[in-house]
Amino acid sequence: MLLPRIPHAFGRRRGPSVRRPARALLVLLTGALGLALAMPTGATASPPPASRAATDIAPSATGTPLRDGTGLYPRAIRLAHSGSANGRVLAGVVTFDGNNGIGAIHESTDSGATFRQVGAVADPESAAGQGLCCATLFELPRQVGAMPAGTLLWAASAGQDESNRRMALRIWRSNDIGRTWSYLSSCAVAEGTGGLWEPEFSVAADGALVCHYADETDAAHSQKLVAVRSYDGVNWQGRHNTVASSRAPDRPGMPVVRKLPNGTYFMSYEICNPGGQYQCVVHYRTSADGWNWGDPAHLGFRPETADGRYFRAAPTIAWAPTPGGGSNGRILLIGQRLLNRDGTPAAGSGRTILTNTQNGSGPWSAMPSPVTVPNPEVNYCQNYSSPLLPSPDGSRVLQIATDFEGTVCRAYFASGNIT
């Protein structure tokens, strides 16, 4: 299936990728993604009329705007390996300058109370309508090759709208806290027209830099999750599946990995195309070393509350220490929509974080999210892949979430207590 066109080829789809014209009319709609998800694989959705979320003048989201104009797929980190800059918060979003995709880097020196733009990644492979999607931001916690701890990495999907599409996950580095950036390497390059999406980084137990991503290039799988590693940030090796369903239409996507205090690596992701109430439901699985994740055909576990509520689509995770002690700390999880046990929208959808103090086992608890996106629909903007950044003492969490303002998808931030 094909999702309707979104601005300047931000272009993350939940169905098999096909090449589209580099310039197209903007179609923003609240229910379009949900409509496309319900269609059989290979179908093409005809754009319905723009709905309320795409035409309202004012946004419904709470919080403070991160920037003027477009801010897609936000990411946030707190520097912890950068000397005198430790404690600063950096936030990245995908935006556009005309038809050029840009990774805008913002900085806060007051724990996320205010932000200002301090840098930008302008990849020539994302310029002139070639396409840019789903960027990530990462601080190296230790030296990798010649890159010292504190080196910043930015990576994104590039090239989805080229006339002869060969997408790549292109990595850029910064040695000056995000002010300037230089190209480093690509952790994946497509041999054909299939898509490569949503890169995220972790450092495995052996010190390797690991790039996790969603891969549409395997004819045996509509989409799967893949990992590849590098010991110098330049040369990549060991590409292997981490989640690849035995059902070809299934689409695992949007992996995010965090290391827990006990050494376990925790990965959250969505799985689209099962249909019914479990369409794009959030799952997780774990690894002892951050590289070996077990049988890829094992789809993992669904985190849910004691009364059966669970998230649909676009998850992110974070780990927070427990104030006053506690060896496990807390895992924080957010997704685009919160559903009840029967698959109906839950009352807290767009305003809830789930937490767990047992390394993911057992029931999860619900708490209010700092940013509220009321009644989000399944689309590329509303509450889509919202990053969570706990305070160093684990008492508060910063969230950046996106919502429509008219036809513009904007990023909003706020902090709140972890309860």
Model-derived features: positions:
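Hydrophobic core segments of beta-strands in well-ordered, beta-rich domains
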Residues: 75-98, 136-139, 146-165, 170-172, ...
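Loop/turn-rich, solvent-exposed surfaces of beta-rich toroidal or solenoidal domains
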Residues: 272, 279-282, 307-360
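Secretory targeting and sorting signals
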Residues: 1-47
